[in-house]
């Protein structure tokens, strides 16, 4: 078990990119607990990761949907990678799904990569599924949730871009989302609302991640 208190400053560390994984055979050896971020293309995964670790350009952001085409691994800097000196956590930025304009063979490759990773990674502690707060859970999102349920992978919903809607609309979105999760066995019941642009909800997300890897 990792001590929660000893990790409290981890998001003040400098973080670095260590590996891009284009296919499942390039995955790094299983080591530290992994926290993955999944979501539709352009939902704001890379922006949220940057805001989470207080670095503007750690994860590459783009207005072009489908920019993230690999599993991108990030860890706190300063660890050697030796078994006795592994980083306490790795963040994984997953390829966005639901991008219809990409070539079919590319979409198929992304889909296979996502599904293979989610099914077989024992060090994966939780997937944060990012949902645009303006739109709620769409068909592609529901398909990922179904996969996570079947694979018994713990996941939690994070609403992004929450500053783009009125607070009353956001409150209703949270209620609606909670209702949709009631019959999903792998879903963590608490919904997190965030805004990368306004730094809203980030402390709650950091705390949730730390509690997850401390178990």
Swiss-Prot record:
PROSITE patterns: G_ENGB. SUPFAM superfamilies: P-loop containing nucleoside triphosphate hydrolases. One of its GO terms (biological process) is division septum assembly. Keywords: Cell cycle, Cell division, GTP-binding, Magnesium, Metal-binding, Nucleotide-binding, Septation. GO terms for molecular function: GTP binding; metal ion binding. The keyword Cell division applies. InterPro entries: G_ENGB_dom (IPR030393), GTP-bd (IPR006073), GTP-bd_ribosome_bio_YsxC (IPR019987), P-loop_NTPase (IPR027417). Pfam families: MMR_HSR1 (PF01926). Mg(2+) binds at residues 46, 68. Its cofactor is Mg(2+). GO terms for cellular component: cytosol. Residues 31-215 form the EngB-type G domain. GTP binds at residues 39-46, 66-70, 93-96, 160-163, 194-196. Gene3D superfamilies: P-loop containing nucleotide triphosphate hydrolases. Necessary for normal cell division and for the maintenance of normal septation. Belongs to the TRAFAC class TrmE-Era-EngA-EngB-Septin-like GTPase superfamily. EngB GTPase family. This is Probable GTP-binding protein EngB. It comes from Bartonella henselae (strain ATCC 49882 / DSM 28221 / CCUG 30454 / Houston 1). The gene is engB.
């Amino acid at each position: 078990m990792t001590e929660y208190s000893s990790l409290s400053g981890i998001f003040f560390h400098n973080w670095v990119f260590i590996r891009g994984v284009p296919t499942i055979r390039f995955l790094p050896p299983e080591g530290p607990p992994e926290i993955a971020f999944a979501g539709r293309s352009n939902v704001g995964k890379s922006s949220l990761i940057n805001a989470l670790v207080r670095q503007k350009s750690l994860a590459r952001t783009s207005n072009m949907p489908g920019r993230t085409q690999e599993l991108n691994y990030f860890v706190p800097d300063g660890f050697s990678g030796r078994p006795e000196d592994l980083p306490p956590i790795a963040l994984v930025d997953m390829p966005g799904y639901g991008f219809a304009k990409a070539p079919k063979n590319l979409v198929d490759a992304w889909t296979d990569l996502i599904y293979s990773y989610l099914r077989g990674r024992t060090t994966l502690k939780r997937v944060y599924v990012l949902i645009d707060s303006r739109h709620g859970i769409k068909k592609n999102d529901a398909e990922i949730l179904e996969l996570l349920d079947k694979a018994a992978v713990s996941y939690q919903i994070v609403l992004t871009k929450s500053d783009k809607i009125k607070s009353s609309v956001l409150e209703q979105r949270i209620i609606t989302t909670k209702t949709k999760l009631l019959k999903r066995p792998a879903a963590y019941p608490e919904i997190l609302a965030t805004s990368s642009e306004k730094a809203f909800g980030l402390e709650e997300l950091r705390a949730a991640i730390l509690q997850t890897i401390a178990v």
